[in-house]
Amino acid sequence: CAERFAQSFADTYGMTVTCLRFANVYGPHIDGLRKQPPFVGYMIRELYYDRTPEFHSDGNQRRDYIYVDDLIALALRVVEHPQKGFDAVNVSSNQSYSVRELYAIANRLMGKNIEAKYCPSSHYWAKYPELYGGAYGIKPEILDHEVNKFSQCDNTHAREVYGWQPQVDIETGLGRVIEAETRMLEGLEK
């Protein structure tokens, strides 16, 4: 793990090294146009075009999301107030949201009422047969676990050591992303 190497260098050479562990980062300029965009970008793009999004899960999976401006604010504090030796800091909201919860917020903020389609996670990965083959193919159950995992980070260390806490709640952050993505998508239509 990279953190262990960083800690080894910090310990061996007396270096100051801080690793930032990002939760799911979202914010304006998320790439919603690529073939397989991040969840937030995909959801906004499909709603913008009045299409039914297909989520490859039951929608109950929960993740911790952090708005990009909050991440930057913490990164700046870490640079301005470095701790001696090695440090690892979770950059997170300390809250988790399900696919269904985020979709409901985006649907409402965009003034839409489009029901999502929930499919088995295996349908998503079927588009990538190269993942399963070869000498180091990934087992389907590992990919399924990746889709269905729960993640929530504890940002107590960031709050206590760096005096930081996230300022942008999920609804405000999604609203900003929707605004930016809508402007971008409208620009493509001109």
Identify what each model region corresponds to:
Residues 2, 22, 36-40, 64-68:
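The catalytic Tyr-centered alpha-helix of NAD(P)H-dependent dehydrogenases
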Residues 48-190:
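C-terminal substrate-binding subdomain of Rossmann-fold SDR/epimerase-dehydratase oxidoreductases
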Residues 15-38:
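Flexible, glycine-rich beta-alpha linker
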Residues 12, 43, 145-148:
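Short beta-strand/turn micro-motifs at beta-sheet edges
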Residues 1, 5, 9, 39, ...:
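Hydrophobic alpha-helix immediately C-terminal to the catalytic Tyr-X-X-X-Lys motif of short-chain
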Residues 1-18, 23, 47-49:
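Active-site Tyr-X1-5-Lys
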